[in-house]
């Protein structure tokens, strides 16, 4: 089993991503996850 997590808001430092940053980084995470899943299927 493999888990890939992305954090957009920190409860400790109160930092958060803008909507655009969240969209961009989540898209990157999804692409990476799909690439990894394809590699694991080989």
Curated annotation (Swiss-Prot):
InterPro entries documented for this protein: Nucleoside_phosphorylase_sf (IPR035994)
Ligand binding (a purine D-ribonucleoside): 8-9
Catalytic activity: a purine D-ribonucleoside + phosphate = a purine nucleobase + alpha-D-ribose 1-phosphate; a purine 2'-deoxy-D-ribonucleoside + phosphate = a purine nucleobase + 2-deoxy-alpha-D-ribose 1-phosphate
EC number(s) reported in the record: 2.4.2.1
Keywords carried by this UniProt record: Glycosyltransferase, Transferase
Site feature (Important for catalytic activity) residues: 22
Keyword Cytoplasm: no
Transmembrane segments: none
Gene Ontology biological process terms from the UniProt entry: nucleoside metabolic process
Keyword flag S-adenosyl-L-methionine: no
Entry-linked SUPFAM superfamilies: Purine and uridine phosphorylases
Top-rank taxon, per record: Bacteria
MF annotations from Gene Ontology: purine-nucleoside phosphorylase activity
Active site feature: 9 (proton donor)
Family: Belongs to the PNP/UDP phosphorylase family.
Chain's role: Catalyzes the reversible phosphorolytic breakdown of the N-glycosidic bond in the beta-(deoxy)ribonucleoside molecules, with the formation of the corresponding free purine bases and pentose-1-phosphate.
Record's subunit section: Homohexamer; trimer of homodimers.
Protein name per Swiss-Prot or TrEMBL: Purine nucleoside phosphorylase DeoD-type
Gene of this entry: deoD
């Amino acid at each position: 089993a493999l888990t890939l997590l992305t954090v957009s808001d920190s409860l400790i430092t109160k930092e958060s991503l803008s909507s655009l940053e969240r969209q961009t980084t989540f898209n990157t995470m999804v692409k990476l996850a799909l690439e990894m899943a394809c590699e694991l299927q080989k």
